[in-house]
UniProtKB/Swiss-Prot annotation:
Its cofactor is FAD. InterPro entries: FAD-dep_OxRdtase (IPR006076), FAD/NAD-bd_sf (IPR036188), SAM-dependent_MTases_sf (IPR029063), tRNA_MAMT_biosynth_bifunc_MnmC (IPR023032), tRNA_S-uridine_synth_MnmC_C (IPR017610). HAMAP family: MnmC. The gene is mnmC. Catalyzes the last two steps in the biosynthesis of 5-methylaminomethyl-2-thiouridine (mnm(5)s(2)U) at the wobble position (U34) in tRNA. Catalyzes the FAD-dependent demodification of cmnm(5)s(2)U34 to nm(5)s(2)U34, followed by the transfer of a methyl group from S-adenosyl-L-methionine to nm(5)s(2)U34, to form mnm(5)s(2)U34. This is tRNA 5-methylaminomethyl-2-thiouridine biosynthesis bifunctional protein MnmC. GO terms for cellular component: cytoplasm. Residues 282-699 are annotated as: FAD-dependent cmnm(5)s(2)U34 oxidoreductase. One of its GO terms (biological process) is tRNA wobble uridine modification. Its EC number is 2.1.1.61, 1.5.-.-. It comes from the Bacteria. It comes from Shewanella sp. (strain MR-4).
Length: 699
């Protein structure tokens, strides 16, 4: 059963409000819109900024009603022959977040797609991706990675200034939409320049002279297009200005260096992956599978080493897992990251599920993913938890597609069983089978790139020799690999190179409960003191225990009773709770790796021995604290070259794992990231040490 969908009244903005924030495309005819898109693409092929290593990166200032974006994506889809294997990444910066419901309302009410019906398929794909009204970047992937759209919502200067520069794949061209052109100032244009190639061009329709001057002063060439030119009436109505000022280009270089120096404590890979050298991945769960898929979408080969006979036998082995974002009252980096990650994972699941239904002779079978986006209903279970939940609800004006408050009657209607208390409903959440998710990701990766999986291969030792990594397993030696990723869950700290990572194992026992009587009517995931899923194949999942440094992974009768007790405490006097039967002693035990700050670990493996050695050298006394802080702030943090960490997903790996894997894949291949510097700093595997060192504190 599926919970009833959220009501449209949850969305606050009507069409007149939307049309003011997202003005219609100035190019009213299909011909003029197509001409603008063709012009943009033709300028790419005439510049030295042709697609770099199979990836073309374009920027867009403003979303408007989205037609310029739709036209670009549609042209890219239909130009398979001319573009070859080149992929497209479009980074759109829009100050006013918008969701799929509002986008559809905008398109329907304006009837803007009626005369441009060729854009309807890609418009439907955008709507299906369900962009949300959240702050930050939302990465949308289409056509098996051939097209990627990054929607950067929120303050424009913040979005630009906090975005890492990609030296290998900078932005090659910008389109400035008229309704936001007046908001561009010198600081923003310089940040755009920092993120761009030195000969990137800024294109716009009827660009103001002041904006063109700003662009020229930061080293941008400009192309000012008139309406007549796009209507095909005056081919000479293109005003192009080429800027080749070496001083301005040097200032751009300094700006990039300053940004890199300011974030030196979050190191970048020292050498990028190449397609003819596979990346080694140790692990067999959701994180490693999604990393393999993200790499494959880039054409990057990889080799997986899994200690079990199939994927998803560790923490990813549960029958059902809840998927929904972690929110905080402050809506801080943690909360914003989990919203971005949850939405990304949800899109992954839907894309893989669609692919599993499209079996052909040319494409091997993709594992079907059991899942139901039936929503997640969160309620308090005691006074303290209720106060915390109330604080989360009341502290922010949460987008309704992320979560909204419900009263007791609405909670009962959503759950289809007696709840009788108010709560917080996550309408896009639900449950998914983690091990099927992992298998589907690897199945899809095998269609896109050269991937290999070694099962029943437990890696017991890793070593670095001459800047290459070798893996040892039962007398076998694998390698050399230029890049090695440790994504092996509970075994993450088993190697000498990773044993000091500040991360802890927690045992979790999930109980399997027969679906019967009123309990079987549950239509949404319940989250209170523990969680309870709707039935799947005749069983509910109830859990989970949370035991640090457990001595064994055997079934524990006490934890089985504790799982039941949590539901009894959360929903007292409800008849359906009496239907929870744990007498079969059916359960599954796994270990999840947890960090103190609840962020996953993603990025370069820290050289902890070198960090401690430098600490002894630079943290000699209190008088040198400021000097030490400056050293750690501006000096690249020590890393183990070629070794990377992807782990610490905790109890919300279904939400956080796929985006963390996507970001690591982008780092390994030198591509632009969908995360900003503050979030990357929080994900940095060295953060527990560097956080103190950057403040001049003792370790």
């Amino acid at each position: 059963m599926t919970a009833k969908p959220q009501k449209s009244c949850q969305f606050k903005r009507d069409y007149p409000q939307l049309i003011n924030l997202y003005p219609p495309c100035a190019l009213t005819t299909a011909q003029s819109l197509d001409n603008l898109t063709r012009l943009r693409l033709s300028r790419l092929t005439t510049q030295s900024t042709q697609p770099i290593q199979g990836l073309c990166v374009m920027g867009q200032w403003g979303l408007g009603d989205g037609l310029e974006l739709l036209s670009l994506l549609q042209h890219w889809q239909t130009q398979t022959q001319t573009q070859g294997n080149t992929r497209l990444l479009v980074k759109v910066f829009e100050p006013n977040p918008i969701n799929d419901y509002e986008l559809k309302l905008l398109w329907d009410q304006s009837q803007s797609l009626i005369s441009k019906s060729h854009l309807q398929p890609i418009a439907n794909a955008i709507l299906k991706a369900k962009p949300a009204r959240i702050i930050g970047c939302q990465r949308l992937i289409f056509d098996d990675g051939r097209i990627t759209v990054d929607l950067h919502f929120g303050d424009l200067h913040t979005a630009l200034s906090q975005l890492p520069h990609s030296a290998d794949h900078p932005i090659q061209q910008w389109l400035v939409l008229p309704h936001l052109a007046a908001q561009l100032n010198g600081k923003q244009v310089w940040q755009m320049a920092r993120l761009s190639t030195d000969d990137a061009q800024l294109i716009g329709v009827n660009l103001a002279e002041t904006l063109q001057q700003l662009a020229h002063k930061s080293g941008f060439s400009t192309l000012n297009v008139s309406q007549d030119a796009l209507n095909g009436d005056a081919s000479d109505a293109l005003q192009s200005h080429i800027i080749t000022d070496e001083i301005l280009l040097h200032e751009r270089k300094l700006l990039r260096q300053q940004a890199d120096t300011a974030q030196a404590f979050t190191p970048k890979p020292t050498a990028l992956a190449t397609k003819d050298h596979p990346i080694a991945i140790v692990g067999g769960g959701l994180a490693s599978a999604n990393l393999m898929l993200s790499l494959a979408e880039r054409g990057q080969s990889s080799t997986l080493f899994c200690k079990d006979n199939e994927l998803g036998q560790g923490a990813s082995g549960n029958r059902q897992g809840a998927i929904y974002p972690l929110l905080t009252p402050e809506n801080d980096e943690l909360s914003r990251f989990f919203q971005q990650a949850f939405l990304f994972s949800r899109r992954r699941i839907e894309a893989l599920s669609h692919a599993s239904m499209m079996e052909t002779e040319a494409a091997p079978t993709i594992t079907a993913i059991s899942h139901d986006f039936c929503g997640v209903l969160q309620t308090g279970h005691d006074e303290r938890s209720q106060q915390r939940l109330d604080k989360i609800i009341q502290s922010q004006d949460w987008p309704a597609e992320i979560a909204y408050a419900v009263d007791a009657n609405e909670a009962n209607e959503i759950a289809q069983i007696g709840i009788d208390k108010a709560g917080f409903f996550y309408p896009l959440g639900g449950w998914v089978c983690p091990f099927e998710y992992a298998k589907a990701a690897v199945d899809k990766a095998s269609q896109l790139a050269n991937v290999q999986c070694h099962f029943n291969t437990e890696i017991t030792e890793i070593e670095c020799d001459a800047k290459a990594w070798y893996l040892h397993s039962q007398g076998q030696r694998f390698g050399p690999f230029r890049q090695l990723v440790l994504a092996n869950g509970a075994q993450l700290t088993q190697f000498s190179a990773s044993e000091r990572l500040q991360i802890s194992p927690f045992r979790g026992q999930v109980s399997h409960v027969p679906a019967q009587f009123k309990l079987s009517q549950l239509a949404t995931v319940l989250c209170a003191n523990g969680y309870l899923t709707p039935s799947h194949q005749g069983l509910h999942c109830l859990g989970a225990s949370y035991v640090k440094a457990a001595e064994h992974l055997d079934f524990c009768p006490q934890e089985q009773w504790e799982n039941l007790g949590k539901m009894q405490e959360s929903y007292p006097n409800q008849a359906w709770v009496d239907d929870i039967d744990i007498s079969d002693n059916s359960a599954r035990v796994g270990v999840r790796m947890v960090t103190r700050d609840h962020f996953p670990m993603m990025g370069c493996a820290p050289d902890v021995a070198e960090i401690l050695a430098r600490y002894e050298q630079h943290q000699l006394n209190q008088q040198q604290a400021e000097q030490s802080k400056h050293y750690w702030q501006t000096t690249p943090a020590p890393i183990l070259d070629g070794l990377y960490i992807l782990g610490g997903l905790g109890s919300r790996g279904l939400s956080s794992g796929p985006l963390a894997a996507e970001c690591l894949a982008a780092q390994l291949t030198g591509e632009p990231l969908p995360l900003d510097w503050p979030t990357l700093n929080k994900l940095n595997p060295n953060r527990m040490w560097l956080r103190k060192l950057l403040k001049g504190k003792a370790l």
